[in-house]
Amino acid sequence: MYLYTSYGTYQFLNQIKLNHQERSLFQFSTNDSSIILEESEGKSILKHPSSYQVIDSTGEFNEHHFYSAIFVPTSEDHRQQLEKKLLHVDVPLSNFGGFKSYRLLKPTEGSTYKIYFGFANRTAYEDFKASDIFNENFSKDALSQYFGASGQHSSYFERYLYPIEDH
């Protein structure tokens, strides 16, 4: 499974979504633009998307949920260690109130992994983010040992994706 992402204006991305209703397309609002995501076993219908292989997955994407996309930089010599760390987090995320979905994404190009957490709303996500589970497994401090030299060129950061009707 692959996840493709592309940013643009609401109107432009919404037209793509309307023209391809047979595809698994999800549109969200960010602080400064809109984003469209496509989950697919095959090639994307998006023209120039960022492409990721889904290497771990729980739950289904839904446009009515709040998402946090965490960008985790790494280097070639730390990739396997980072993947091993994130693939072996043995925590039932569904135990957290409002949890909806999770995706661990490996880049098809470049060295920045992404982690998507889907929750019913931002408050539920912020509660999860304050937990020991998040701080020990997904926080910048927990993952910084895997950044390698690439940490000088790209940063660990979060981007919030809001349901269109809520933002």
Curated annotation (Swiss-Prot):
Entries under SUPFAM superfamilies matching the protein: Dimeric alpha+beta barrel (SSF54909)
Alphabetically ordered keywords of this record: Membrane, Phosphoprotein, Virulence
Q: Which GO terms describe its cellular component?
A: membrane
> Where does it mainly reside?
membrane
Indicate what this protein is called per its UniProt record: Signal transduction protein TRAP
Question: What lineage does UniProt assign to this protein's organism?
Answer: Bacteria, Bacillati, Bacillota, Bacilli, Bacillales
Question: Localized where?
Answer: Membrane
Q: Which gene encodes it?
A: traP
Q: What else is known?
A: Up-expressed in ATCC 35984 compared with ATCC 12228.
The record's function comment reads: Contributes to virulence and biofilm formation.
Concerning InterPro entries, the annotation shows: ABM_dom (IPR007138), Dimeric_a/b-barrel (IPR011008), Heme-degrading_MO (IPR050404)
Q: How is it modified after translation?
A: Each of the three conserved histidine residues contributes to TRAP phosphorylation. Phosphorylation is essential for TRAP activity.
